[in-house]
Amino acid sequence: MSTGRVRVRFAPSPTGIFHVGGARSALFNWLVAKGAGGDFVLRVEDTDASRNRPEWTEGIISALDWLGISPGGYEGPVFQSERAGRHAEAAAGLFAAGRAYYCGCTRDELAARTGNAQHGYDGFCRERGLGPGPGRALRFRTPDEGTTVVLDVIRGTPEFPNDTIEDFVIARADGSAVFLLANVVDDLDMGITHVVRGEEHLSNTPKQQLLWAALGTPPPVWAHVPVIVNEKRQKLSKRRDKVALESYRAEGYLAAAMCNYLMLLGWAPPGDEEIVPFETIEASFRLEDVKPSPAFFDEKKLRAFNGEYIRALSVDEFVAACEPWLVPAADVPAAVDAPAAAGTGDGAAGVTTAVPAPPWSPERFSAEVFAAVAPLAQSRVAVLSEIVPMVDFLFLPEAPTDEAAWAKTMKGPALDLLTEAAEAYEKVAWDHDVLRETLIEVGERHGLKLGKAQAPVRVAVTGRTVGLPLFESLEILGREETLRRLRAAVERLDTAANPA
């Protein structure tokens, strides 16, 4: 298949969680296709039946949708497992052409002959003339001489002497093609012109380039993007590092912030600004500008990015974005978690993000109350999940209990101050400026400045020593509930001071 159009593919395996490295590769491929007016193909490489799970495939599609690579904007998904017949046909063709041979060597036999052979298989069956049969794998006949030169947009021209490349297996003894062959055959048949993938695949590239040549077709443009490392400069690991894209979604990272940050892992937009609209990224991204050196995944920087994106939302958008963390089983709102990568579909509409249920019952939540407090909270959260402990006092029947906070603040003049504050608040206009001035007056009678005077009031009403602006919070909570909590705190302090 050859159309003259740029055609890229993203080819994940559904054998585990979809991680940030896969997300970056998908975005890089997407932008190569978009920038050239070409095609993006989603190919699910699901040939490992023992490890594949349908939910992993669903997770890949959902994650791409969240990133803005939405169904309808690309070809696929194409499932590699459905192309087994074509892979077998290609393997048979290579055998018939003398470019591959059958090998009956077991691992034990190979080890007995070679020990720890530097270059792997020793070619024992190369000239034995074996045909297909039980226990026989098909190996590619690697050229004895010459050098395979890989033309890589990012890495230049790495060279691989052919005598260092073993006769590698291309089909198992059961006839199924291994990754190396299936990947090449699918790329060839789908007319893939650019292969953009992780650096870890570079070692496979000379073998695959030899297969492309054996199948009579020039190889695609290669581009191996840099490995992503943690703060210890170790390659990101699913077992060791926080890499699951879904965990970031559940924590409250916005798709736009995630896309922006992932694009910086190996590439940088022109100018000094790193936080830029995706349209700017799309217009300026070029594979030639990707750096080959390892890219550091800095979660603190990502968090800072996300805070900037949250603050850039309108209040209505912020309210909608917070909904999954405030209302049990709410879907991710499409209004905010919509496609970040050029707006090609419905974003996350209909996709439920697994976020913890809030600590209050659904009937206690008030959208009107949250809309009132949202402007106070928006500038104070870096991820959306932080909204829950910030506003929980508004929707719980009692202020959250923090005994350490209580012990720290409920001493000295706290009992008298809370008693007088409750009495004063019963009479004044319920306005945050009035509430503030009133507490200043109460505090002055006890020799306390406002910072000290408001500490026991905050703990009594919100359960915490820090939080949203206190007097605006009291205004939103309302006179009746504020007075009830202040009096409950007074009663507790009085009981402790005067036990029966």
From Swiss-Prot:
Keywords: Aminoacyl-tRNA synthetase, ATP-binding, Cytoplasm, Ligase, Metal-binding, Nucleotide-binding, Protein biosynthesis, Zinc. Zn(2+) binds at C103, C105, C125, E127. Binds 1 zinc ion per subunit. Its cofactor is Zn(2+). The keyword Cytoplasm applies. A motif ('KMSKS' region) lies at residues 235-239. PANTHER family: GLUTAMATE--TRNA LIGASE (PTHR43311), GLUTAMATE--TRNA LIGASE, MITOCHONDRIAL-RELATED (PTHR43311:SF2). Belongs to the class-I aminoacyl-tRNA synthetase family. Glutamate--tRNA ligase type 1 subfamily. Catalyzes the attachment of glutamate to tRNA(Glu) in a two-step reaction: glutamate is first activated by ATP to form Glu-AMP and then transferred to the acceptor end of tRNA(Glu). Monomer. This is Glutamate--tRNA ligase. It comes from Parafrankia sp. (strain EAN1pec). The lineage of its organism: Bacteria, Bacillati, Actinomycetota, Actinomycetes, Frankiales.
